[in-house]
Amino acid sequence: MQLSIRHETLYRYSVAQAYSIEQLHLTPRSEPQQRILSWHITTPGHCSGYSDAYGNVSHMLTLNEPHESVRILVEGVVATTLLHGGRLLTQENLSPLIFTVSTRLTQPTPLLLALADACLPKHGNKVTTSDVLRLTSHIFGAVAYVTGATDVFSTAGEALTLGAGVCQDHAHVFLACCHSHDIPARYVSGYIDPESTGHAASHAWVDVRVDDVDFSGWVSIDVSHNRLMTDAYCRLAIGRDYESAAPVRGMRRGGGDETMRVEAVIVPV
């Protein structure tokens, strides 16, 4: 499948800002299951590119002059491959063990531990696709998709206790459960063809390391839709949680109020 992607992020400030810096994960990863056919980033200031610790294509946008808004636009076309059972084709140098570490957003709580124990094998840190799909189904039923119920600072434990959240919360609950059993699992940010789900085009899901009879490696799962990843997905970045894989994340100096508008349009071509 080929996906045409247009993603605009617009920040507006009530007073002029003296300085702002934004870390961007807005370029699709170079992986066997997806290929960039064209891609362009438009920013208002100096934007330097680099590869981060997880192998994500990253950019650092810096604005040193007074500004009342920041507009970031990415456009391009990506060719994706239909995967068998959500199995990634990627061969990586990163040790899976770095994705067994809990973060502030994925710290275990008694409720999370109970969920993990109910769905995952009691002994050892190896799981099958069936095991993690069982966990996915339980999270799908326990945490309703409710826009505005949480924010980017909400933890996995808070979302599970509330019983509501969005895609990043579903991902964090899944990661917290896996990490409590020392199972490698990681956060994925990216895009999805909304025609395949009916939800927003900017999305988050998870990769988890499985050991099936005929496969040992990463399987990609969309917890919010209780399904395996297909060719309707474009992968931007991986990380331990939202904070390490967010499409746009930064800070500013200047005070006042901030509003943000995000518009992502993904169309199969």
Q: Language model features by range: what are they?
A:
Residues 1-84:
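Intrinsically disordered, low-complexity N-terminal segments that are enriched in acidic
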Residues 19, 26, 43, 56, ...:
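Generic structural "secondary-structure junction" signal
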Residues 25-27, 42-44, 75, 207, ...:
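Residues in well-ordered beta-strands of folded domains
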Residues 47-50, 95-97, 227-236:
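Short, surface-exposed linear segments at secondary-structure transitions and domain or protein termini
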Residues 78-80, 94-165, 173, 242, ...:
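Secondary-structure boundary elements
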Residues 82-85, 245-247:
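Short helix/loop capping segments that flank catalytic or ligand/cofactor-binding pockets
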Residues 86-93:
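"Short basic amphipathic alpha-helical interaction patches in structured regions
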Residues 122, 137, 169-252, 256-258:
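Hydrophobic/aromatic-rich core segments of domains that either
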